[in-house]
Structure formats: C-alpha cells, structure tokens
C-alpha cells in the first residue's frame, strides 16, 4: 500500500532509462523488418570505452569536460561503426540480419572484455557521475535524456521523409 510514492516512481524511471533508449533504437530496426541481436554487446563496448576516454587511459585529456564529451561522443561513434559493419555484411553478402548481428553479439562482448582486461571499470569523476545521479527540476537527468530521445524518435518516425521510409521498408522491402 505504500509503494505509490514519488521515490518509487523516480527509482523505476531511472532503472528503465537505458532500456527505453536502446528500445527506441531497436524500434527503428524492427520497423524496417530487421532484427539486431548485437545491441547488448554494443552497449558493453561503449560502456567499456567511455571511461577510457574521460579518465585519460587511452590518451591524455587536458580538460575533464573535454574528456567527458569524448567519453560520450566516441563510444557512440565506435558503436555506430560496428552497426554500419553489420549493415554492410547484411547488404554486401545478403546475410540474414539475425546471423550477422549474432556474430557481433558474441564477438562484441569479447571485445569489451579484452579492452578492459576483464576488469570492472571503476572511476570517480563527479562531473560524469552527475549524468547518473544529477536532477533537473527534481527529476533524474537520465529521465530527461530518455524523454528527449523518445520525443525525437517519435518526431522522426511521424513527421520526416526518413521516418516514413523506415516504416515503408518494414511493410514491404521491395516497395
């Protein structure tokens, strides 16, 4: 009877943010009639790479804020590269998407393990941790990011030519 509190809502929203953001990307993939099993592995690679950028493990970073920006942007670029590789495999060799992404699903977790030497990434960078524990207007920062991603994806799917093409391809690839 005491579970309907703002604290419970806040905790639940915070816990689903990552899943919702990844789910938005998967929605776009599924809307095209495809499937991507490598999402979790790409999250592992990005999660392993991010602290390496802002802690200066890969190369010295003169400013913590530049390091944080690199720690956000470069893992997205790296994950996008792997996604493009999957797309290239599927288109160039006519491999079924489930098979191509299964390969990266398996290899990606290995890449993440090797890049961290199997160690847990532990870091104390308060400026970066603000993304996880910070609040804006009393709402966790992660929730704001999730809401923005959902709104942008909904707008793209409903109001842009690209979004309509994504939905059209999923309905009939030859159309």
Regions found by a protein language model. Name each.
Residues 31-84:
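Membrane-embedded helix boundary and interhelical linker motif in transport proteins
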Residues 6-9, 28-49, 89-102:
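Short, non-helical or kinked segments that cap or interrupt transmembrane helices
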Residues 12, 20, 41-45, 69-77, ...:
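Hydrophobic alpha-helical transmembrane segments
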């Amino acid at each position: 009877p005491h579970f309907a509190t703002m604290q419970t809502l806040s905790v639940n929203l915070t816990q689903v943010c990552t899943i919702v953001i990844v789910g938005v990307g998967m929605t776009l993939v599924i809307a095209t009639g495809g499937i991507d099993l490598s999402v979790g592995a790409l999250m592992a690679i990005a999660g392993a790479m991010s602290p390496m950028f802002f802690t200066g493990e890969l190369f010295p970073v003169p400013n913590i804020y530049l390091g944080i920006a690199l720690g956000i942007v470069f893992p997205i670029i790296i994950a996008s590269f792997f996604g493009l590789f999957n797309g290239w495999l599927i288109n160039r060799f006519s491999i079924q998407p489930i098979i191509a992404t299964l390969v990266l699903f398996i290899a990606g977790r290995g890449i993440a393990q090797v890049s961290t030497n199997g160690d847990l990434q532990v870091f104390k960078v308060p400026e970066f941790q603000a993304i996880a524990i910070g609040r804006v207007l009393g709402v966790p920062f992660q929730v704001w990011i999730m809401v923005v991603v959902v709104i942008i994806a909904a707008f793209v799917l409903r109001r842009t030519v690209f979004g309509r093409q994504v939905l059209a391809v999923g309905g009939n690839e030859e159309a």
